[in-house]
Amino acid sequence: MELYLDTANVAEVERLARIFPIAGVTTNPSIVAASKESIWDVLPRLQNAIGEEGTLFAQTMSRDAKGMVEEAKRLNNAIPGIVVKIPVTAEGLAAIKLLKKEGIVTLGTAVYSASQGLLAALAGAKYVAPYVNRVDAQGGDGIRMVLELQTLLEHHAPDSMVLAASFKTPRQALDCLLAGCQAITLPLDVAQQMLNTPAVESAIEKFEQDWKNAFGNLNL
């Protein structure tokens, strides 16, 4: 599987990359805007943080296919091998088809239904990103949608993969993996929740106390 961090915070990527076996970093316009850095400044820094083998994702801003393709080429020139995120609209699907012919790897983003995700995959997107928590927030069932999308891709677009996004809890991420997702991207707060387990700290403290009581120190 592929595990990504959903952030443009370079310092946090460097910190968590030492801990998590991350495959790379995903960004979107809101995430980049929150960083207060120009996208052309922050992307090289993120790539440096994840190393040459890490995969970086960045999104286009244009609403029409021509503009999306032009921006995708610009992103690819700046960071060779970058995966370009394209919103799965009618124009986005047209752009994904064109970029497939150009050899630029894409991710279909802002996916709220299994049918929408399937169309992105059939158009040529390597990755499809369903918004799990946002679907839940609208009264839907994000995990069920992911399961349906995963099944559709396995049957009809096996060269594409689900990269599930938009999580509020580690449980949502785990449920996506149980549904068969090959890739997920975690916001920093959810990644941190996975690390912060009070019961683990309590167990370690008990081990230390028992050892110290027996041997007078904490050395092996």
UniProtKB/Swiss-Prot annotation:
InterPro entries: Aldolase_TIM (IPR013785), F6P_aldolase (IPR023001), TAL/FSA (IPR001585), Transaldolase_3B/F6P_aldolase (IPR004731), Transaldolase_AS (IPR018225), TSA/FSA_arc/bac (IPR033919)
Any one Gene Ontology molecular-function term assigned to this protein's record: fructose 6-phosphate aldolase activity
Reaction catalysis annotation: beta-D-fructose 6-phosphate = dihydroxyacetone + D-glyceraldehyde 3-phosphate
A GO cellular component annotation in the UniProt record: cytoplasm
Transmembrane domains' residue ranges: none
Record bears the keyword Cytoplasm: yes
Active site: 85 (schiff-base intermediate with substrate)
Leading EC class: lyase
UniProt keyword Chloroplast, yes or no: no
Gene Ontology biological process terms, A to Z: fructose metabolic process
Keywords for the protein's UniProt record, in alphabetical order: Carbohydrate metabolism, Cytoplasm, Lyase, Schiff base
E.C. number: 4.1.2.-
Compartment list: Cytoplasm
Major place of residence: cytoplasm
Pfam family, one: TAL_FSA
Assigned protein family: Belongs to the transaldolase family. Type 3A subfamily.
Subunit (UniProt): Homodecamer.
Function: Catalyzes the reversible formation of fructose 6-phosphate from dihydroxyacetone and D-glyceraldehyde 3-phosphate via an aldolization reaction.
Name by which UniProt lists this protein: Fructose-6-phosphate aldolase
